[in-house]
Amino acid sequence: MAGLDLGTAFRYVNHQLHRPDLHLHHNSSSDDVTPGAGMGHFTVDDEDNNNNHQGLDLASGGGSGSSGGGGGHGGGGDVVGRRPRGRPPGSKNKPKPPVIITRESANTLRAHILEVTNGCDVFDCVATYARRRQRGICVLSGSGTVTNVSIRQPSAAGAVVTLQGTFEILSLSGSFLPPPAPPGATSLTIFLAGGQGQVVGGSVVGELTAAGPVIVIAASFTNVAYERLPLEEDEQQQQLGGGSNGGGNLFPEVAAGGGGGLPFFNLPMNMQPNVQLPVEGWPGNSGGRGPF
């Protein structure tokens, strides 16, 4: 029965069962039992059960070797039980970790709101803050009341005027740079309004005592470049040619004590150079406040 088709056999048996002249009887006597009669009478339900059982064997892989056809289609069972490929649904919607910047750029400007308490020197407080934090401070504005103000007015031929009493701050601007910046790079300009409506202003050269809470709006930075303008022709040629100083002194003009001005340099505030920067070459140092 190796080449027997199950479908053809089923149709043949079904046709034989529906013949009126053919009847299958079960012989109960043990003497007439044939080798094939032990299965009982053959019906359509038995054929359906056999087909269903064989279909289950084919789907499950047919590893028991019950029939040649079931074993030949063993690979089809693997396709039925295989996991689907690709991402599981919803895997792309998982929350991503936030991006955290742990290091700040040296060229970043930071905004500050500085509050000076009553009785303190506003100029000295801001200068000390810039020196300890090793950051350059650019004062944008200020508000509050001050007393005992010493200012220098350009219209009075550099005379220093000391104002007694309480004054309201109208405008406050300036810059504070820690070393190695020269003292001339630090200055503070203020305009005040008196109790009788008078307005006076100038560069702060002495004490600027706060008569109450003084709020200073400022921005800070760490990367500073000092340059002397206008640029000379030889300096422009050196910059165009890539520079010819070699690996010698980083500040040749400063070390030699010449009056050519400060060369370009760009150093972090926490790096102290090994040379002394000239102070006399900067204008406005004679009438200003002393260094930090």
Curated annotation (Swiss-Prot):
Gene Ontology MF terms: minor groove of adenine-thymine-rich DNA binding
Nucleus keyword on record: yes
Coiled coil start-end: none
Pfam families: PCC
Keywords: DNA-binding, Nucleus, Transcription, Transcription regulation
Domain PPC: 106-242
UniProt-annotated location(s): Nucleus
Domain comment as written in the entry: The PPC domain mediates interactions between AHL proteins.
Role noted for this protein: Transcription factor that specifically binds AT-rich DNA sequences related to the nuclear matrix attachment regions (MARs).
Protein name per Swiss-Prot or TrEMBL: AT-hook motif nuclear-localized protein 23
Organism: Arabidopsis thaliana
